[in-house]
Amino acid sequence: MSLSPALLADAGAAAAGAHGAGPGPVLAVASALALLGYAWVGLLRAPAAQGDAAVRRSVPPMALAWTAQFVALFIDISGYGLAAPGARFGFAPALSMTIWLVLTVYLIESRFLPLHSVRRVLAWLAAAAVLLAWTFPGESRPLAASPWAPLHWVLGLASYGLFGVAVLHAALMNRAEARLRQRQPGPGGLPLLQLERLTFRFVAAGVGVLSLAIFLGW
């Protein structure tokens, strides 16, 4: 029994299409879960007297969204399901990774500092970043010749995240300073001196990581 060349070509194209569409459903589910979780947190409102209770209610959806966004980023950037080995990269996944890193630092710091006032803002920013990365997943890039290329990309994204965290802290610092001048402690009582120290530390860390990324990519 022999198969015609046309039949073989059609079978090969179908197999390649099935392989290329592999990450589609998983990426869609992860992105949808992240969007739902962040939207839940963004829409969650409570009186000032119930601030801590509102934060506790937002922990499960925030954790679900944060994890789902990480899964979506891993599937998208790693190039899972691509016919050729390599990675997939673009502006939208880079922005989503940056927001995810900023949110990670916020989740850690919020356990020690009263930063609850920016929770809903970060949730909406993360939701927008997830939607952009889902809509524009980036272009496929074959594996680079240099073994340091993956580390170069990771460090570059990490530096963007650190700079994003520094910008967030600078905005919080300006807000705290304005309230201090008006003699209004404001919700959460943001510690101005701690925010100032953290801002400069994140800027210094971002410069150091970016310098290392440039050195490895030279």
Where are these regions (language model features)?
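A generic, lipid-embedded transmembrane alpha helix
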Residues: 61-78, 128-133
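N-terminal signal-anchor/start-transfer transmembrane helix
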Residues: 28-50, 169
